[in-house]
């Protein structure tokens, strides 16, 4: 359901973005280390641009879970959440529950294992260490690790929206473009966050 922001308007213009009456809200587990919460929220909100292309604004929102309401539970199936799990599993996953009659996605509880940061560290130091001095450290700066967390959380949110891996997207980019600094800055190195083309390891130091 959508509502038009123009007072008294019977119909919304095709070019006007409308707000859903019930936006998708994904809460961040209060147990999540505070310094990573803004990056997880941004990973959710990064999908707003995709919904804007479909005509909706503020259709998906990441926010901190309430901590002052004793009746609110992170495990309540009426709420979607990114759940922090203090585990040595180096992974994250984005399952969802859907209504088999309509296909409507009802809720998600994204699994965010603490040790996914070790996985991110290993990926980045191997794939980007040649061109990013920030990768050649025993521990990444919070800003770098935060951006890596943002990227993975956005990927997992994509799964909760029903998207599968898009391994073909990176194949559309010619190798020479991956070494073209201006082109990559303008277009990125892969068209889809759902690909596994995580970092541009084709690029070389200038």
Task: Give the role of each language-model region.
Residues 59-82, 173-177:
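Acidic helix-start/capping segments at beta-turn-to-alpha-helix junctions
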């Amino acid at each position: 359901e959508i509502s038009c922001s123009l007072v008294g308007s019977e119909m919304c213009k095709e070019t006007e973005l409308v707000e859903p009456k019930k936006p998708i809200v994904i809460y961040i587990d209060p147990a999540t280390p505070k310094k990573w919460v803004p990056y997880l929220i941004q990973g959710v909100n990064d999908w707003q641009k995709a919904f804007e292309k479909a005509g909706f604004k503020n259709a998906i929102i990441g926010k901190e879970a309430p901590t002052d309401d004793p009746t609110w539970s992170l495990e309540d199936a009426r709420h979607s959440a990114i759940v922090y799990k203090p585990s040595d599993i180096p992974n994250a996953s984005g399952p969802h529950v859907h209504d088999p009659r309509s296909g409507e996605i009802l809720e998600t509880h994204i699994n965010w294992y603490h040790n996914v940061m070790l996985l991110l560290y290993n990926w980045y130091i191997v794939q980007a260490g040649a061109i990013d001095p920030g990768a050649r450290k025993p521990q990444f700066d919070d800003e770098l690790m935060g951006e890596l967390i943002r990227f993975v959380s956005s990927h997992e949110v994509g799964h909760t929206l029903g998207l599968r891996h898009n391994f073909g997207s990176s194949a559309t980019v010619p190798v020479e473009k991956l070494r073209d600094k201006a082109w990559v800055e303008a277009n990125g190195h892969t068209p889809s966050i759902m690909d596994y083309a995580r970092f541009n390891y084709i690029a070389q130091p200038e």
